[in-house]
């Protein structure tokens, strides 16, 4: 429950809206439960995307798309979120960014070539000329991860492997304990407050107990 509470507070602070934060949190919990990534990976990616300026309603869908690519190429999800977010804040693609995508095995140049109706070797010239904006990169990511795309549905497919199922079971257990903790939050908080009082006032409590004896 503690981990969930921290995430809930973090999203409420970032969004300034409890309802939006709760909606996003429920989406992320479900995504973690049906993909090979754990809740912490998914939540960290969500926080990064929000910090880069992604709207709350688009965060989970974007994470799923980036997660499909990350799962397909066995690269860290947050690494790809960083690269995507950096391109978004720059509002265009630079040569070094294209190289970073390509270096990770992401066929971005191929997708951009299709978009612009040019050969792959001409994409670099378009990037250098500043003609490839973030919307084009976003469209390329969507094309790669739509149903039937190169990476479409890979996270869900990987979640059916033994490793993926173990990760999903761990997330399900965390979710179960969170629900139990939420239902008993008042009791737990009172218990913790009582324990804190005992620790902070152990000398006073000790004297009282000695007097009783």
Across the structure, where does each feature detected by a protein language model lie?
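Residue-level recognition of alpha-helix termini/interfacial anchor residues
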Residues: 122, 184, 201-202
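Small-residue helix-packing and pore-constriction motifs in hydrophobic alpha-helices
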Residues: 1-34, 41-52, 58-71, 79-150, ...
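Gly/Ala-rich hydrophobic membrane-inserting helices
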Residues: 1-3, 135, 203-213
């Amino acid at each position: 429950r503690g981990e969930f509470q921290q995430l809930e507070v973090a999203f409420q602070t970032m969004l300034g809206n409890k309802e939006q934060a709760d909606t996003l949190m429920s989406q992320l919990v479900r995504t973690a439960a049906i993909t090979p990534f754990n809740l912490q990976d998914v939540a960290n990616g969500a926080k990064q995307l929000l910090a880069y300026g992604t709207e709350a309603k688009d965060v989970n869908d974007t994470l799923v798309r980036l997660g499909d690519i990350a799962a397909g190429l066995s690269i860290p999800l947050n690494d790809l979120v960083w690269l995507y977010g950096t391109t978004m804040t720059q509002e265009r693609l630079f040569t070094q960014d294209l190289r970073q995508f390509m270096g990770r095995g992401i066929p971005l140049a191929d997708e951009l070539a299709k978009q612009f109706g040019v050969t792959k070797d001409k994409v670099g010239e378009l990037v250098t000329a500043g003609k490839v904006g973030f919307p084009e990169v976003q469209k390329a990511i969507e094309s790669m991860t739509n149903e039937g795309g190169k990476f479409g549905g890979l996270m869900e497919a990987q979640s059916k492997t033994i490793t993926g199922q173990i990760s999903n079971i761990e997330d399900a257990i965390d979710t179960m304990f969170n629900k139990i903790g939420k239902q008993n939050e008042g009791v737990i908080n009172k218990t913790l407050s009582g324990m804190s009082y005992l620790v902070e006032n152990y000398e006073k409590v000790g004297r009282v107990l000695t007097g009783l004896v």
